């Protein structure tokens, strides 16, 4: 065998081994039955950090918004979210990060799959569909009622008050 053939075989073997190692470490994707039916009173519900942790631990699906009262995009979006929640009879939970104390930021950044994948690379408002610590889907930025409907309608059971 030529030296180049041996090198080629070694390179292919290394690629195969690395592929097996990395594929074996990939997270198992959880499959969900959509649409989710949400529990709770319709409307916008502010959570403290400890209440957010309780929602995560419940493993029930919920819509979660991260916002800041000092964020102009949040100021525009939150009234849209409130009207949407009432119109479609769903609870939408949110947390105001301007009210965080101590290590609540650190806790939030470790609390679900979205933050683990996007560490430090996100802004407000961010809307997530969470089941436990699994961020099933998310939308970053301000949107209108139609955009919110487009984001939520495939995964959340929506019915109007009419």
Model-derived segments and their meaning:
Residues 109-122:
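Short, solvent-exposed, Trp/other aromatic-anchored flexible loops in extracytoplasmic proteins
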Residues 76-77, 107, 144:
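Residues at alpha-helix caps and immediate loop-helix transition turns in enzyme cores, especially N-
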Residues 69-73, 98-102, 134-136, 145:
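Solvent-exposed loop/turn segments at secondary-structure junctions
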Residues 120-162:
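Non-catalytic, surface beta->alpha helical segment in thiol-disulfide oxidoreductase systems
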Residues 51-94:
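Local sequence-structure signature of Cys/Sec-based thiol-disulfide redox active-site neighborhoods
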Residues 1-42, 162:
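N-terminal targeting signals for export/organelle localization
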Residues 43-46, 66, 90-110:
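Thiol-based oxidoreductase modules, predominantly thioredoxin-like and allied folds used
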Residues 44, 69-76, 119, 140:
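Extracytoplasmic/periplasmic, Sec-exported soluble proteins
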């Amino acid at each position: 065998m030529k030296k180049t053939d041996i090198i080629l075989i070694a390179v292919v073997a290394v690629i195969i081994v690395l592929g097996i190692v990395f594929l074996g470490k990939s997270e198992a994707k959880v499959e969900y039955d959509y649409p989710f039916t949400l529990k709770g009173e319709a409307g916008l519900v502010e959570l403290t950090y400890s209440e957010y942790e309780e929602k995560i631990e419940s493993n029930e699906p919920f819509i979660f918004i991260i916002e800041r009262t000092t964020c102009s995009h949040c100021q525009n979006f939150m009234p849209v979210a409130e009207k949407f929640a009432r119109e479609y009879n769903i609870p939408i939970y949110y947390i105001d990060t301007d009210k965080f104390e101590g290590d609540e930021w650190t806790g939030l950044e470790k609390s679900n799959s979205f933050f683990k994948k996007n560490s430090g690379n996100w802004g407000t408002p961010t809307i997530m569909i969470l089941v436990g610590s699994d961020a099933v889907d998310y939308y970053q930025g301000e949107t209108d009622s139609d955009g919110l409907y487009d984001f939520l309608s495939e995964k959340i059971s929506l019915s109007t008050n009419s």
